[in-house]
């Protein structure tokens, strides 16, 4: 009887114990703030909701080079024939997401998580010409826009056509960095080509037609003429500096950088933003799950938390001034009015969905930069 009692007690004790501890490994491209965000904010939240689980984030470095290291890591494990890979979740740039899908290195999971249906932007389905629908969830969307000084610009242009007229009437008051010193200038040039260089959908998604770049001569000649009346800035930070000093009245910026500088007092609080029609590019960072992740279900739970309206509101928008990866209208209820108004007063969610564009597919993107050097910069 005593033995039976002890045995029952032992079984009950086992039942009360937490399940076997699991470690979720997340690797992320990008700056150190990406690693810190997961290790210091998102990871502890997930661990609290999933007792016994540990989240470990490792960074691979900024830019496409950081994402390339993730591709190489997964490719090596695939080539080695491993049954389970040592990465559960990866955070990659847009181009890498397409390459990972093409190389059969990812699991299709978006339809299996509750937040999958909250995605609204087309860059979650197409990544620089590659169909990635179902394989990615955007962590956030970064976006370029035109910053302007309302004291100097009473009625800001709403389109590239209106901007051309404004610059002609206000020479040297618009500034950008060309294609040197930062992607804000590159994004402005890409937006110009979307407006005047041919079919936007083809530039965004392909197929690439080699001879099409020859049709850009008119658009590039117009840009060269436009540049005669603009001020060339030293880069992303240089454009903001010149706006702050009143040396220019308007110029392209990264929205998150704009708001970060505004919060720190580096630029005046009354500067505003406008997103030009037919659109300007930005780019997301994507959550992906490797095809043979050791903990795929846990990875899905992690990404569902990371892309929930609450986390998108408090983590992505409040902490970093990024636009949410999911539909912004789903995030509004989770934000205090001041934070929402700061991010969406100038550029409404509807405008962001309509005019926030991806960058072109690589052959067109490279072609635009090369053509700018040859036909505009010289």
Task: Label the model's feature ranges.
Residues 345-378:
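Conserved C-terminal helix/tail region of periplasmic/extracytoplasmic solute-binding proteins
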Residues 188-270:
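Ligand-binding pocket segment of bilobal, Venus flytrap-like solute-binding proteins
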Residues 101-109, 130-133, 261-275:
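Ligand-binding "clamshell"
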Residues 79-89, 107-146:
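A structural signal for short loop-to-beta-strand junctions that line the ligand-binding cleft
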Residues 280-281, 285-352:
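Mature extracytoplasmic/periplasmic domains
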Residues 22-94:
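Early extracytoplasmic/lumenal segment of secretory-pathway proteins
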Residues 17-21:
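Sec/Tat signal peptide C-region and signal peptidase I cleavage site
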Residues 142, 220-226, 267-288:
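Periplasmic-binding protein-like
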């Amino acid at each position: 009887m005593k033995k039976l009692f002890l045995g029952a007690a032992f079984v009950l004790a086992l039942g009360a114990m937490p399940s076997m501890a699991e470690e979720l490994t997340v690797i992320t491209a990008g700056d150190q703030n990406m690693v810190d965000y997961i290790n210091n904010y998102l990871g502890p939240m997930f661990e609290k909701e999933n007792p016994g689980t540990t989240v470990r984030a490792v960074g691979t470095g900024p830019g496409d080079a950081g994402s390339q290291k993730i591709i190489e890591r997964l490719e090596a494990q695939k080539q080695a024939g491993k049954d389970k890979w040592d990465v559960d979740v990866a955070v990659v740039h847009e181009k890498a997401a397409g390459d990972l899908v093409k190389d059969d290195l990812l699991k299709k999971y978006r339809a299996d998580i509750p937040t999958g249906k909250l995605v609204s932007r087309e860059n979650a389905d197409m990544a620089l010409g590659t169909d990635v629908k179902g394989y990615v969830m955007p962590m956030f969307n970064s976006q370029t826009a035109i910053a302007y000084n309302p004291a100097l610009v009473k009625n800001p242009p709403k389109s590239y056509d209106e901007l051309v007229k404004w610059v002609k009437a206000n020479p040297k008051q618009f500034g950008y960095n060309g294609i040197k010193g930062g992607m804000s200038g590159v994004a402005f040039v890409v937006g110009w080509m979307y407006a005047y260089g041919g079919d936007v959908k083809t530039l965004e998604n392909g197929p690439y037609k080699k001879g099409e770049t020859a049709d850009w001569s008119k658009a590039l000649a117009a840009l060269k003429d436009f540049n005669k009346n603009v001020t060339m800035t030293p880069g992303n930070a240089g454009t903001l500096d010149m706006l702050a000093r009143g040396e220019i009245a308007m110029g392209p910026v990264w929205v998150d950088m704009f708001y970060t500088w505004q919060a720190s007092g580096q630029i005046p609080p009354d500067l505003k933003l406008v997103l030009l029609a037919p659109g300007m590019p930005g780019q997301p960072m994507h959550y992906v799950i490797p095809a043979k992740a050791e903990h795929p279900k846990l990875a899905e739970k992690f990404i569902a938390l990371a892309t929930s309206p609450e986390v998108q509101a408090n983590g992505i928008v409040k902490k970093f001034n990024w636009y949410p990866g999911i539909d912004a209208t789903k995030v509004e209820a989770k934000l205090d009015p001041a934070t929402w108004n700061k991010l969406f007063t100038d550029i409404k969610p509807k405008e962001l969905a309509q005019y926030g564009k991806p960058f072109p597919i690589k052959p067109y993107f490279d072609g635009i930069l090369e053509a700018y050097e040859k036909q505009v910069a010289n």
